[in-house]
């Protein structure tokens, strides 16, 4: 089995570009490629899936702190694949705080036992690149740095200069490069790359990127260095559900942030998933419960407001006591109002208050939460790990039901409250991965059964 991680020396070096190019080039060769993403990102995984035609999976060691559960989130999915490609997050050793082994790409690579290919930015550098590679290669002797790929290289001559320096001063093999004009830069906005569903020319960009990758990166050598013994493991989770349930979930251009593992976990527990569109459908489908994931309701605020019949059906389901769970963009939709650039749009109105878009991030990163009331997560005092990433605030006088903290290097660096519960509707900015604790999902299913 061929497995490797692509990790940058920092954010912004072109790690995602290189990853997409390699995914495309390998897929063009006929390989079945299983992609993964370290950390909580939803958008990169959608790009991976677009190329490989396989759902990309998040491998997140903060939200999934148990090593067995973390390994399951990785090994479960590539048994029928030829190659597993893992895209790192931020810089190789960047994680939570200053501990290089806390939620970093490096720590996950060591836990999984896979080699790392380092991505560096070749723009305006030559021999200094060797010092950078040397530092990364020697910083953690337990980490296998199998090679380096140089991004944004000006010319073949420039590549030979950097390659010569790295191979003169380090033992790390240079596997190739991408030229600075390999493809037009992928556009982004406040939450990172623009989602693939909003890109009209994405497949053409992928074709260009795949061709440049095949031309300039030694894929044969990369795959040689990535060959590892097959490893299989058994499912560490023990929960079960004998009662068939139906969960309808929002899935369209406005709402599409879901962890694939969460959806598959639900399916494995006898839950039928039914997608619906708050943009296009006239009413909610019949279901035992409803799930509104994150996304970009602010981009589609006019269309969401215009679909008044659908909004009314959501509020009716709430009033009838149907369990509703919403994360981030889902919270914004279930609120009363959404303000974008001075324009105010009516939303569902389950929670009184207004979501207001902000110029900067209002919350970013991992956090630990504790429920202050009995909820779908379980009894009061239930611990939940999650991730927040939003350019908005929810201005409301509704009571909060979560106590949240951000902890770095053992110290609480921020504390706040959030999350709202009214009847059987629960909404917060927190994105949650259920592999962290199977009991959270068991509690949610019990909560749904009690309501029905």
From Swiss-Prot:
One of its GO terms (biological process) is cobalamin biosynthetic process. Pfam families: CbiA (PF01656), GATase_3 (PF07685). Residues 246-439 form the GATase cobBQ-type domain. The keyword Lipid metabolism does not apply. The active site is at 328 (nucleophile). The record marks 431 as: Increases nucleophilicity of active site Cys. Its EC number is 6.3.5.11. Pathway: Cofactor biosynthesis; adenosylcobalamin biosynthesis; cob(II)yrinate a,c-diamide from sirohydrochlorin (anaerobic route): step 10/10. Gene3D superfamilies: 3.40.50.880, P-loop containing nucleotide triphosphate hydrolases. GO terms for molecular function: ATP binding; cobyrinic acid a,c-diamide synthase activity. Comprises of two domains. The C-terminal domain contains the binding site for glutamine and catalyzes the hydrolysis of this substrate to glutamate and ammonia. The N-terminal domain is anticipated to bind ATP and cobyrinate and catalyzes the ultimate synthesis of the diamide product. The ammonia produced via the glutaminase domain is probably translocated to the adjacent domain via a molecular tunnel, where it reacts with an activated intermediate. The a and c carboxylates of cobyrinate are activated for nucleophilic attack via formation of a phosphorylated intermediate by ATP. CbiA catalyzes first the amidation of the c-carboxylate, and then that of the a-carboxylate. Belongs to the CobB/CbiA family. This is Cobyrinate a,c-diamide synthase.
